Amino acid sequence: MAIESKTVSFGYEEVEESEKTGKVGAVFSSVASKYDVMNDAMSAGTHRLWKDRFVRRVKPRAGETILDMAGGTGDIAFRMVDSGAHITVADINAEMLAEGVDRALDKDETRLVWSQQNAETLNFPDAHFDAYTIVFGIRNVTHIDKALAEAHRVLKYGGRFFCMEFSQTRWPGFDKIYQTYSHHILPKVGKAVANDEASYRYLAESIAKFPPMEDFRAMIQAAGFSQTKVEPMMGGLVAIHSGWEV
């Protein structure tokens, strides 16, 4: 009997389950050195404000342990490190981590720990961290449910889960404007600034394929988190999701 292969979405393309991690890896290896340019292009520069707001919601505290997953370039970790929290920056992509380490060296920042990790199979003990953060990363995971289950596993009782991700805006008319921008203009921006139209097209498509806010909230609850919340920004173009391991 032939074994039926499973497919998953890679943007608008359906690919074999076993292929997605490698394809996503190739995208982020390509954009690693231009990561800030990519985020500026996707958010018109507002990602910096969103990330500041995200960190205010996390409220990192001195002495606690935080896992910043898919945090390779250190964008979120650098915002949290002065709190005195012990932060591990994890990413599946070596090039993204290398970019973060280089930035840390430029800043003379030695307080962060860097670790190459797959969000679906974390190499950390149970109940290890006080908080888990992931920003603009979970939509690129092959099995989102497995990544959420791992986040729940590595959090201590009373631990906090925070995720910021693109979604679909509910502002009348703005959704069409953003769809036009992300699907037709953004790839051309990618070609102009990074000579990489395909990666930017995937990133736009991956946003469109990500579950709506309330559906993703239900996935977080299904992973075992309690007191889940969704905080939409720009009408839901971006949302901060949170939950507790209790």
Residues covered by each model-derived region:
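Conserved class I S-adenosyl-L-methionine
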Residues: 160-190
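Class I SAM-dependent methyltransferase SAM/SAH-binding core
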Residues: 65-121
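A short acidic, Gly/Pro-enriched loop at the edge of an enzyme's catalytic core
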Residues: 120-132
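Conserved alpha-helix/loop element of class I SAM-dependent methyltransferases that forms part
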Residues: 30, 34-37, 41-64
